[in-house]
Regions:
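Acidic, mature catalytic/reactive cores of soluble proteins
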Residues: 3-7, 170-176, 334
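Extended, non-transmembrane interaction/recognition domains
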Residues: 135-146
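Alpha-helical solenoid scaffolds that mediate protein-protein interactions
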Residues: 19, 26-27, 32-33, 290
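Short coil/linker segments at helix-helix boundaries
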Residues: 2-18, 267-277
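Surface-exposed patches in mature extracellular/periplasmic domains of secreted proteins
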Residues: 31-39, 298-303
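Flexible, polar/acidic helix-loop-strand segments at domain edges
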Residues: 87, 99, 107, 147-249, ...
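Long, intrinsically disordered, low-complexity segments
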Residues: 20, 43-126, 130, 203-206, ...
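Structural register within alpha-helical repeat arrays
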Residues: 2, 249, 256-258, 263
Length: 404
């Protein structure tokens, strides 16, 4: 080019105001709401987990007192409900079962190759809302908890699980498969011992395919977000039909809070004459709906009033609430955070350790032994290159920076 920017280099807060106004119109329609499942109460100790004292016990949406946060979040994705009954969905598509094999361990019909990085795992908070980095050394320990439990009538926690996988927020259990995680597979009708499989990712564990070393997990964690309790990757079984949410109401709530935060102290008037300005009360009200549905503490007016604090909270919530929903790729780019995020080494547990080497297994290491584990990002990658054939057809076009 002639030194002219094709994209304005001047920040325009009115665009955030327009986004906030659009999100608020969707909220005010009253057509959508966060999906929730009622609290489960029984005398067997297998119902809804007690709320930490840091989480409001008021009824939803002012707290999480009358809902089961684990089932409320999990059932948005696992096919428990027909899509027409989930008011959170704004737009969705039918989902293929093909990628389930990436999640399932080899022993129950998968190849266990979907590996979640340690950086992602460490973003999940403790049940009481503390960051994992604020957990005690005992809570971060590799040692076995030593006792089993069941909650939400269906989720079983093995006594062999590490302390670091205990007492985490409900979305952790709804989303992550970890070492000694139990995969129910209740629809299995065969004679093999495949139901309630306690999966391990050790070198000699039961998650990998002994005949093909490529079919194994690389970090010791996988994704279970789209796996129903009935699902199992075996022909003598069934799988729940599922949809993939392309847009859901939680996006509207987080988007509204983010847009209001980015307006700073300026105020704007929309085409209908409405005044749009940063409102911490509104930010807290709608942001906290997402937090309460997840069984997490709400944020305060003081936190919402501080721009940098709120920005960090918003980014964290986007990352966890929308984990493995094809959002992170775009969020990192629109925030211009991709360079830092992708130029970090991939970390995970030491899956080369054997079952007799438990402490070594839970030692966090950098995985860079295979080509596809080495990732990089340069600033030119914020834009895609223009195809050479297109450039040759139109001499007035200019290649995007860095792609010459």
């Amino acid at each position: 080019s002639k030194g002219e920017h094709f994209i304005s280099q001047t920040e325009d807060k009115s665009k955030w105001a327009a986004a906030a106004a659009t999100y608020k119109r969707i909220i005010d329609m009253g057509q959508y709401e966060l999906h929730t499942v009622a609290k489960i109460v029984n005398d067997k100790g297998t119902g809804t987990l007690p709320l930490p004292t840091t989480v409001s016990s008021a009824d939803f949406p002012d707290g999480a007192g009358d809902i089961d946060p684990y089932k409320s979040y999990r059932s948005v994705f696992d096919g428990t409900y027909q899509p027409y009954s989930v008011k959170e969905y704004i737009y969705y598509c039918r989902r293929s079962d093909g990628d389930d094999r990436l999640y399932f361990p080899s022993g129950i019909g998968g190849n266990a190759t979907f590996s979640v990085t340690q950086d992602m795992i460490d973003e999940y908070r403790m049940a009481d809302g503390r960051a994992f980095s604020e957990a005690t050394e005992a809570e971060k320990s590799y040692k076995a908890v030593g006792s089993s439990s069941t909650f939400a009538l269906e989720y079983q926690l093995s006594s062999n699980r590490a302390c670091r996988d205990d007492n985490r927020e409900p979305r952790y259990y709804a989303t992550i498969g970890f070492n000694y995680c139990i995969w129910p597979g209740t629809s299995y009708r065969g004679t093999e011992n495949l139901k309630n499989r306690e999966v391990t990712y050790y070198e000699d564990g039961n998650a990998k395919d002994a005949s093909n070393n490529n079919y194994r997990n690389r970090t010791g964690y996988t994704c279970r977000k789209y796996i129903h309790q009935e699902d199992i990757g075996h022909w003598n079984s069934t799988k729940k039909s599922k949809v993939f949410p392309l847009a859901r109401y939680a996006e509207v709530l987080l988007g509204y809070a983010e847009a209001m935060n980015e307006m700073d102290s300026e105020s704007f008037t929309d085409e209908k004459g409405n005044i749009i300005q940063r409102n911490p009360d509104e930010m807290v009200k709608y942001f906290n709906q997402v937090r309460y549905r997840a069984g997490q503490p709400g944020i305060t007016i003081a936190e919402a009033s501080d721009y940098e604090t709120m920005k960090k909270l918003v980014k964290h919530e986007w990352q966890i609430e929308f984990a493995f929903e094809n959002r992170r790729y775009w969020d990192l780019r629109r925030w211009k955070d991709a360079y830092d995020a992708y130029n970090k080494p991939i970390r995970g547990l030491d899956v080369s350790a054997k079952m007799s080497q438990r402490e070594q297994f839970y030692t966090i290491r950098v995985w860079n032994t295979e080509v596809y584990m080495k990732r990089m990002f340069s600033n030119k990658m914020y834009f895609w290159p223009i195809d050479r054939n297109v450039l040759q057809k139109n001499g007035k076009l200019v290649q995007n920076p860095g792609w010459n």
